[in-house]
Amino acid sequence: MTTRYIFVTGGVVSSLGKGIAAASLAAILEARGLKVTMLKLDPYINVDPGTMSPIQHGEVFVTEDGAETDLDLGHYERFIRTKMTKRNNFTSGRIYQDVLARERKGEFLGATIQVIPHITNDIKRRVIEGAEGYDIAMVEIGGTVGDMESQPFLEAIRQLALEVGRDRAMFMHLTLVPYLAAAGEIKTKPTQHSVKDLRSIGIFPDILVCRSDRAIPNAERAKISLFTNVEEKAVVSMRDVDSIYKIPALLKAQGTDEIVVKRFGLDVPEADLTEWEEVLYHEANPIGEVTIGMVGKYTELPDAYKSVNEALKHAGLKNQVTVNIKYIDSQDVEVKGVEILANLDAILVPGGFGERGVEGKILTAQYARENKVPYLGICLGMQVALIEFARNVAGLTDAHSTEFNSETPHPVVGLISEWLDEEGQVEYRNEQSDLGGTMRLGSQLCHLVKGTKACDVYGSETINERHRHRFEVNNNYREQLSKAGLIFSGLSSDKSLVEVIEIADHPWFIAGQFHPEFNSTPRDGHPLFESFVAASFKLQKS
C-alpha cells in the first residue's frame, strides 16, 4: 500500500487547535472510504507525558496497547475509527533516549552522533513505521514554527516529503488571523510572517488553515493567498464554533478534502458525513439538561479531564440531554463542607494522584452514597468510594490507601506488586520502581458478574477497558467488605484484581478501576457514561 502524508504545522501562537483541525480533515477523508491514521510528534524532552503535571500538559491519553500519550490522540480516536498505538506518538526525549542507547551499544560504528542525520533519520523511520498500512497519514508537529525544540522535526518532515515526492506528501499550516476591535479589521500580517518562517526552512504549505473568531472575508483570503503563495481555494477559514464536531462539515464546505484527493490523484467517492450530521442534530435538539459535579484535584484546567468531559457530552448526545459540568476542587469539599455538592444531578470523581484533596473525594463519595445521588467513580474515584464504604459502613475505622497513609491500620487499597499486561505477560513493581512507565497500563479484559448493574449496563459479561494506575483493592478485605454489602461486580481476567464495585441499595452507584472515558466517541458513546447520564436525568424528573 502506498501511503500519502499530510504534515500539519502551526504558527503565530500555540493552542490553535491543530489536533482538532487535523482530526476533522482525517474524518472527512475517512468518510470518503480512505484508511487514515494520525501521528503526533512532540518536541519536549520528556520521554512521554506520563509524569507531567496535568495542570501544565492536560490529560494523559492511554492507548489500547498501554502508551501514555498526548491528549491530541484522544481527539484522533474520537474523530476517526482508527485506534492509536505506541507508534502514533513520540517525543524528542524518546528519540534521544533511543539514539543514545544505540550509540552506547556501538551500533553507529564510532560515528559522531548529530541531529542531522541521526536524530532526523530516527524521526523519519518512526513516521514511516507509524504510517505503514494506511492510505493517508496525518502527521502533526507539536509547538509552533520558530520554536527551537521543533527544528529537528520540521527538518525531518522536510526531508521525508522530498524523499517520497510531491504526489505523496503535502503540508497543512495552521495560523492565527486576529480581529482587532479597535481597528475594526482582520489582521493578516502574523500569518504572512508565520508562512515566511516556514518557507525559510524549506517547507511550503499547500493548505493554510486560518483560525479566527469570525469567518474570514474573501478579500482577506485573497490577500493571504497573494503574500503566502498558497492558492486562494486552499486558504481555509476556520472560525470559532460552539462545538468541535462542526469542524468536519466546516472544512468540507470549503473543499479542503477535495484539495487533498486531487493533489494525491485519488479516485474516491464523496464524503458521507451522515453520522456527523446525526451527532450535530442531537447536540442542537436536547430534550432536557443535567448538571454533573466533577470533583477532582486539577479542576483549574478542564483539559486535565478532557476525555471525561467529552465522554459526558457523548452520553448527553445519546440521551438527548445537555450535560453541564460543574468543576469542584476536592479541597473545597474539605474546607467548605459537602453543602457545596447540593443541587447536583449526579457526581463524578475522576482519576488522580497524590494526597492533596483526597479526603474531600472521600467525603464526596459518602455524600453521594448517603443522599442517593448517582455516582460514577473512575480509577481513584473507585478507590475513594471503597475507602469511604470501609470506614463508614464496614466499620474499618481509619481505613485508607497506602498511597496516602503507609501506616493505616486497614490498608484496603495497596500497591500492585504484579499483574498481567495487555499481552498477558506478568509485570512486577515495588516501592523503589521508577514512576514513569511502571503502572498497569492499556486495555485489560474484565469479567462482570451476571445480574449486577454493571453487567446490565454493558450488556455483556466480558469487557475491555483501559487502565492507568499503581494501586488496587487489597484482596484481604474483599470478604469483609462484601459481607457489609459492597458488591464486587467486575474482576480482572485472572480474577485477582477488583475492577468494578457497586452498591445495591442505591439508584446508581458504580465505580471502576479503569478509565472508560478513553473508549467513548461522539458517534458511539460509551454504555457506562450513557447509563450514568440517563440515571441522572431520570432522578431529576422523579
From Swiss-Prot:
Active site per the UniProt annotation: 379, 515, 517
UniProt binding sites for CTP: 14, 147-149, 187-192, 223
Residue numbers spanned by region Amidoligase domain: 1-266
Molecular-function annotations in GO: ATP binding; CTP synthase activity; glutaminase activity; identical protein binding; metal ion binding
Keyword entries, A-Z: ATP-binding, Glutamine amidotransferase, Ligase, Magnesium, Metal-binding, Nucleotide-binding, Pyrimidine biosynthesis
Alphabetical list of Gene3D superfamilies matching this protein: 3.40.50.880, P-loop containing nucleotide triphosphate hydrolases
Binding of ATP, residues: 15-20, 72, 239-241
Enzyme type, top EC level: ligase
UniProt similarity note: Belongs to the CTP synthase family.
Further comment found in the protein's record: CTPSs have evolved a hybrid strategy for distinguishing between UTP and CTP. The overlapping regions of the product feedback inhibitory and substrate sites recognize a common feature in both compounds, the triphosphate moiety. To differentiate isosteric substrate and product pyrimidine rings, an additional pocket far from the expected kinase/ligase catalytic site, specifically recognizes the cytosine and ribose portions of the product inhibitor.
Protein name stated in the entry: CTP synthase
Species of provenance: Colwellia psychrerythraea (strain 34H / ATCC BAA-681) (Vibrio psychroerythus)
Gene name of this polypeptide: pyrG
